[in-house]
């Protein structure tokens, strides 16, 4: 007869359901007074310069890319699907290929170096 110790696995206990807090209304910026900038600009400073610096950089980037013209569609496809140098029929379609059988693949010593496709 063998001794059985107490199981270390315990079933997860069901968590009591907690109702989410009720929505009172839309959140207003006054609730977060620490994060909100004052509505009136300081003296001597135009209101247009009070924008977020990150937003200003994005605007500059958009202007630079608009001046260069639209990028060719082929470039965007290459970024989405990097080429591996082994272009097979099933690859770009999204179908996965099975790995090659090691018995069928010749080593470089046995024959010429060939593509595994």
Swiss-Prot record:
Residues 103-117 have a biased composition (Basic and acidic residues). InterPro entries: GAGE, GAGE_fam. PANTHER family: G ANTIGEN 1-RELATED, P ANTIGEN FAMILY MEMBER 5-RELATED. Pfam families: GAGE (PF05831). Residues 32-45, 87-96 have a biased composition (Acidic residues). Belongs to the GAGE family. This gene belongs to a multigene family expressed in a large variety of tumors whereas in normal tissues, expression is restricted to germ cells. These genes organized in clustered repeats, have a high degree of predicted sequence identity, but differ by scattered single nucleotide substitution. Their sequences contain either the antigenic peptide YYWPRPRRY or YRPRPRRY which is recognized by cytotoxic T-cells. Residues 1-117 are annotated as: Disordered. This is G antigen 12J. The gene is GAGE12J. It comes from Homo sapiens (Human).
